[in-house]
């Protein structure tokens, strides 16, 4: 079971980290004294940009796969689409939350209020996911829209390989709640203790989710454990918190302190790395034949793609720093021979 759980974590990690980043941005905007409406517009606009990138990515994949990819692939709800929509939803919630914080002048800990609102939304999305995939399906809307709710696509049934709001956006809201917790005054004063509590809480959630799933009486009549179960959601949130704690240990006392860190470098160019690696792993220029390699060959392929993406990331960082110099070179007047 543990290996299967770990295999489901990349997408939750994307959304979880997007939520943490969103909390940092929202807190900075709030500290600048921006009104709630402007905070909402700024963050929602950024979410719309990510959604637009997701749609552009689908167009690119369709063009690359021209001749055998169906047109419906253009409307697939992929992970970038999910991140964009989740950011739009978080922007709406934070606009409301900041308005509440400003309206109620007695609130002394606004980050706590915003974090609790985010955690509550995560719980609501997770608890509604089994229903939105079954008895509460919005069948009355066109499938391209319903697909953002439950991943139905054009196949008349929710698909496990898509990333709809239910349940995936819940991970972004968990990240949002965790982000506000990490920004609190207490967490900043007791940094190591905060991450230790996060790790311990994560382990507790893992075992709580497993215990709840083992009970003879369940809340839902029909449920898909690996895709919509709130119990599995708790398990994955537990793993995310454990990974967050491990990342802190790595950056505070691990090899990341010795200088260059490949993981930090990849994280600084994560969108580019994601965009490019898809073609090498899943696309037409895949470095390995699909469904036809053993574990050793797949592992070697993983190592190869890791170093290739690391090189690409380093090149991107180098070119980014030299952008003014490169633009100046192109703008130089041509000398007569």
Language-model region placement:
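Alpha-helical transmembrane segments and their immediate juxtamembrane cytosolic regions
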Residues: 1-337
């Amino acid at each position: 079971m543990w290996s299967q759980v770990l295999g489901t974590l990349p997408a939750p990690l994307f959304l979880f980290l997007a939520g943490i980043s969103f909390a940092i941005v929202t807190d900075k905007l709030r500290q600048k004294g921006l009104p709630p409406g402007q905070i909402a517009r700024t963050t929602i606009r950024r979410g719309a940009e990510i959604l637009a990138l997701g749609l552009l990515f689908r167009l690119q994949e369709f063009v690359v796969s021209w001749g055998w990819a169906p047109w419906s692939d253009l409307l697939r709800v992929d992970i970038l689409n999910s991140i964009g929509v989740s950011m739009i939803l978080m922007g709406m919630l934070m606009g409301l939350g900041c308005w509440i914080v400003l309206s109620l002048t007695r609130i002394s800990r606004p980050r706590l209020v915003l974090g609790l609102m985010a955690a509550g939304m995560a719980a609501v999305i997770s608890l509604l996911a089994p229903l939105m995939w079954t008895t509460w399906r919005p069948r009355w809307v066109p499938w391209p829209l319903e697909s953002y709710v439950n991943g139905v696509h054009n196949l008349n049934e929710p698909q496990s390989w898509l990333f709809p709001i239910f349940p995936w956006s819940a991970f972004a809201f968990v990240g949002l709640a965790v982000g506000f917790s990490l920004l609190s005054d207490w967490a900043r004063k007791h940094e190591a203790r905060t991450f230790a509590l996060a790790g311990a809480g994560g382990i507790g959630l893992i075992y709580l989710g497993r215990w709840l799933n083992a009970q003879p009486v369940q809340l839902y009549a029909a449920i898909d454990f690996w895709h919509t179960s709130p119990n599995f959601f708790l398990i994955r949130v537990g793993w995310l918190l454990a990974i967050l704690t491990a990342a802190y240990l790595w950056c505070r006392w691990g090899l990341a302190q010795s200088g260059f860190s490949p993981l930090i470098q990849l994280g600084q160019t994560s969108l580019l790395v994601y965009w490019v690696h898809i073609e090498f792993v899943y696309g037409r220029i895949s470095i390995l034949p699909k469904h036809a390699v053993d574990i050793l060959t797949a592992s070697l392929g993983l190592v190869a793609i890791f170093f290739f993406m690391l090189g690409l990331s380093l090149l991107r960082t180098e070119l980014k720093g030299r952008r003014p110099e490169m633009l100046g070179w192109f703008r130089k007047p041509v000398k007569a021979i």
